[in-house]
Regions:
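Hydrophobic h-region of N-terminal signal peptides that target proteins for export
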Residues: 10-20
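Sec-dependent signal peptide recognition
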Residues: 2-10
């Protein structure tokens, strides 16, 4: 537990600076699931992300930020514990960190112990796959919502991924059906969890505005994690035939089998054919999945935009440090690989944006 992740160290340094200045800044930490730097601010010309692009004009943009491990639960442990997986031994699902480190102090707990109100909305710690939230970190109970969900009324049976994320079973429940990898219905933003998470964050900020205590508010969004269940209007922003398509769809030459991955998470969805790791998906399926990912990015950009705009409208932005962080990168068919769980650049490079109230212009760090 001796080695702090650089990101956690930055946040703790900000905390120490606030203490030294005798001014206690609030902290709004926004965590986004499976978000690689597919944003305009990071130079992605196809991505439609106007809210984050505009907001980042007065923020610090880290160009070379990486997750310590491209697995949801491990990456979040690394951030919230300030420790690497190589130090903790926490690499995968089903391992509650307090079973191994009962006296550990998490990042939000550090703030809580120093007089802050701490709260979590949405996906902060990974919940699912026999892994649970850490209630000790928060002043109030975690406000949890779904990661896997469908709005289609024809979807009535619980799917494998829904069961896993609901902590109903750890072994893959083969008796349950596979869900769709995407959904594009003409529905409101709040039909899906991220819209509801944004609204709860807005309500919570209204409550906190008159609070005498400073706050550490963690808000976690699920998209663009699979399934790409996103309102149709976000799909309509893109022409799938004009989105970036992987130019190399074969595994790196001489790469050992354990260094590459095609199946696993993505194979839990109905449209995905069973095949060997080296087999690329049909072009039409690849385009649909890439389309869904970009739609998910635009959807979550709007939800984050709602939260940031409300932070400003309440005046809380004048005394709040904002951190926006992706838990790891993502592969969209590049080198024949999908999702994450490998150590290639695309699976590990993340967006990291930090804004202090006194910042007047963007700073791009390549460190």
């Amino acid at each position: 537990m001796q080695i702090l992740s650089r990101i956690t160290l930055i946040i703790i340094t900000l905390f120490s600076f606030c203490q030294a200045q005798e001014k206690q800044y609030n902290v709004l930490m926004i965590l986004v699931d499976d978000l690689r730097p597919t944003l305009g601010v990071y130079g992605d010309k196809a991505a439609i992300s106007p809210n984050l692009d505009k907001w980042s004009k007065n923020a610090m943009v880290f160009e070379r930020a990486y997750s310590n491990q491209a697995v949801c639960v491990a990456s979040r442990y690394n951030l919230l514990l300030g420790s690497r997986s190589t130090s903790t031994g926490l690499y995968d699902f089903g391992r509650a960190f307090r079973d191994f480190y009962p006296e550990a102090t998490t990042l939000p707990e550090l703030y809580k112990n120093n007089g802050y109100y701490t709260a979590a909305i949405g996906k902060v710690f990974h919940v699912g796959h026999n892994t649970y939230n850490d209630e000790q970190s928060w002043s109030v109970p975690h406000w949890h919502d779904k990661v896997i969900e469908y709005a289609d009324k024809g979807h009535s049976k619980e799917t494998r991924e829904e069961a896993l994320f609901a902590n109903k079973t750890w072994e893959y429940p083969n008796q349950l059906e596979k869900g769709s990898a995407w959904e594009k219905l003409d529905v409101s933003d709040e039909t899906y969890a991220d819209g509801r998470v944004a609204q709860e964050a807005i309500s919570r900020m209204d409550e906190l505005k008159g609070n005498q205590k400073p706050f550490f508010l963690a808000v976690g969004f699920a998209r663009p994690h699979l399934p790409f269940t996103v309102p149709k209007k976000y799909w309509d922003l893109y022409d799938k035939d004009k989105l970036p398509f992987p130019t190399i769809q074969s595994n790196p030459k001489y790469a050992p089998s354990w260094a590459v991955k095609r199946d696993g998470e993505i194979s839990q969805y109905a449209q995905i054919p069973a095949a060997k790791d080296s087999d690329p998906f049909p072009a039409s399926l690849t385009k649909d999945l890439i389309h869904g990912y970009y739609a998910g990015v635009s959807y979550v950009d709007v939800q984050i935009g709602k939260v940031l705009k409300h932070l400003q409208s309440t005046g809380l932005d004048k005394n709040t440090i904002v951190v926006i962080w992706g838990d790891h990168g993502y592969l969209l068919g590049e080198m024949g690989m999908w999702t994450k769980h490998v150590n290639y650049e695309l699976a590990n490079r993340i967006p990291l944006l930090i804004k202090h109230p006194d910042m007047k212009k963007a700073v791009h760090s390549k460190e």
